[in-house]
Amino acid sequence: MEPILNQGYGYGFALGLGAAFALLMAIITKVLTACMGQTQNSERFSTASRSVKSGLISSSTVSAWTWPATLLSSGAWSYTYGIMGGFMYGVGGTIQITLFLFLAIQIKKKAPAAHTVSECFFIRFGKLGHCVYLFYCISTNVLVSSLLLLGGSQGFSSTTGMNTVAACFLLPLGVMVYTTLGGLKATFISDWIHTVMIYIILIVTCYTVYCSSSLIGSPAKMYDMLKEVQEVYPATGGQSYLSFKNSEMMYLTWSVMIGGLSSVFGDPGYSQRAIASDAKSVFQGYLMGGLCWWIIPMALGSSAGLACRALLLNPASVTYPNVLSSVEISSGLPVIYGMASIFGKSGAAAGLVMLFMSITSATSAELIAFSSVTTYDIFRAYINPAANGKQLVRTAHLSVIGFSLFIGALSVGFNYAGVTAGWLLTFLGIILTPEVSAVTLCLFWNKMTRFSLVVGAPFGTITGVVCWLASTYSFCDGIVNKDTVMTSKACFVGNIVSMASSPLYIVLLSYIWPDKETFDLNQFRNITVGDDIDTTELNAIVSQLKDERILKLQTYWSIGINLFILIGCYVIIPTALLGSNHDLSKSSFSGLIIVCLIWILVAAIYIILFPLWQGRKSLANVISHIIRLKAPENILLDGLTPKQSSEDVGDATSFHMDKLDKEKEKSSELKTA
């Protein structure tokens, strides 16, 4: 079948929108420098001064987690499995974010001066343990980045006929430019802009499908149409598009959820957001980010994805009178075709805009994360420990440029090898899930040893891969190849074994060969900052040390929330509906859709307006300086001037740490008395 759009759309979006965003972020970076005195030093480039508020953290979390797979796979799942597809995709992704929230709080609490999580491994386990974790960390970074470009380039190629090789190199081009110019702060701002555009398109799509479209126009009409199409084109496994009774879908969603944990816990892009956030904002930022993200795959799948299925018997369908081929489904085209059926070619173009936004926003997070790891965990740790701020910034810039070219080339290789985004996502989870337990135990368990990390994590990977291939051999009558290893049951076995075996190995080895002395977790505070840190950034680090009581309370809240979402929303509700063996009633289906329509509006209002409200003073300051052409005012802390040396900055940090320790000792003495 011919692409629904011509190549001009593909090249126009990749080059035109990419150049527009690069220019916009260059202007914003210039304005921040001129109006707020935010020069691009090493700390600001990698950590955004550790002062980002919860609103931007939420929008950035939504942006970073809205992969091309979020948009395309949620629609494909809904098209294939019905209403449960978008729901299960959304809940599975949300639990990954809320679980990471628990870890993010510990990063702020125990390593306030960290630039990357892997720095904690260097402090605790030395060079050998650090290198082992770096392998997992960088592998996650590389594979996730390739996954983003692979899914995006294949989506662009299928929709417009654009050359896949050209897409792999042109899509990250604009991202590379504005990330190099603006660093992490520019990434946060661009993430907000990307997310705003995605929400606007999504709201228009959902409300048109269920409220005003002449083809569907109401949840009740969608319900009836799905009933009709079920008679002609039954759902996978002979089940209904209006029920949750599909065991294959359950295996698939659990496999993707478990495997996806590695792309959250191990991907330095997510920890960068925790490091960049204000200590009081990390809880609200990640929690609201997860809740606002859930509605994107749910709403898109239940609108465009279900519309593509429901309209198969209508001449408005792009593929009428045929169903979509397996290639079209695996390419994620149900979303594009569904929007095209409702809006015409403008709908397909809008879907392509959403796809472009998801590619560039998530890729920018990966670029800045890789640059931070390269700068602080490789260059400063092994090549030049005495590197000054300018050298760190230069290394970060070169890392962004080099990594952009590398992942473009790697994505081309994957494409020619016949690897799809879904295949790569499953493979990534099975080989890299052991890093979930490694980073969790590193931050929480003081008895974990270097030997257990060096041996336990790789053994977890080996065990997972062996069980994955053995399960494929068993479930597929002895046939093991690139296609059969994607069997949902085999993927589930590989992911669950890889995740569960690693902590077992680490704990057992730590008890069998323990260290002479247990590790003091307070040593994570020994991580040093760059010599070009200014007083605003120092202020942020010191304030984190003072917020420890708040972070402790948020830890308990995060445990409760994760238990509710994991057990209630991800286990009890789906299994209860699975066991009911009935379709949703028309009123239940309509009620679920109405909840989605309300949720998407509330999420959009929060993501779009709340960051503007939190940043109103900064916006007013920028506007005031532009109008009056005033010179920027520098913020001072405890009498320190912005040009003081790094020794003075370090002394100030140590002073505040010592002061806090004395206050804790005094408090404990009073409690004892």
UniProtKB/Swiss-Prot annotation:
Transmembrane region(s): 8-28, 83-103, 132-152, 164-184, 196-218, 249-269, 287-307, 336-356, 391-411, 424-446, 451-471, 492-512, 559-579, 592-612
Membrane topology: Multi-pass membrane protein
Cellular component terms (Gene Ontology): endoplasmic reticulum; endoplasmic reticulum membrane; plasma membrane
Record-level GO BP terms: putrescine transport; spermidine transport; urea transmembrane transport; urea transport
Signal peptide extent: none
A Pfam family that the UniProt record links to this protein: SSF
Function: Involved in active transport of urea.
Subcellular locations according to the entry: Endoplasmic reticulum membrane
Gene responsible for this protein: dur3-2
Record bears the keyword Transmembrane helix: yes
Name of the protein in its database record: Probable urea active transporter 2
Cited InterPro entries: DUR, Na/Glc_symporter_sf, Na/solute_symporter
Molecular function per GO: putrescine transmembrane transporter activity; spermidine transmembrane transporter activity; urea transmembrane transporter activity
Protein family according to the UniProt entry: Belongs to the sodium:solute symporter (SSF) (TC 2.A.21) family.
Cysteines paired by S-S bonds: none
Keyword list, A-Z: Endoplasmic reticulum, Membrane, Transmembrane, Transmembrane helix, Transport
Organism for this UniProt entry: Schizosaccharomyces pombe (strain 972 / ATCC 24843)
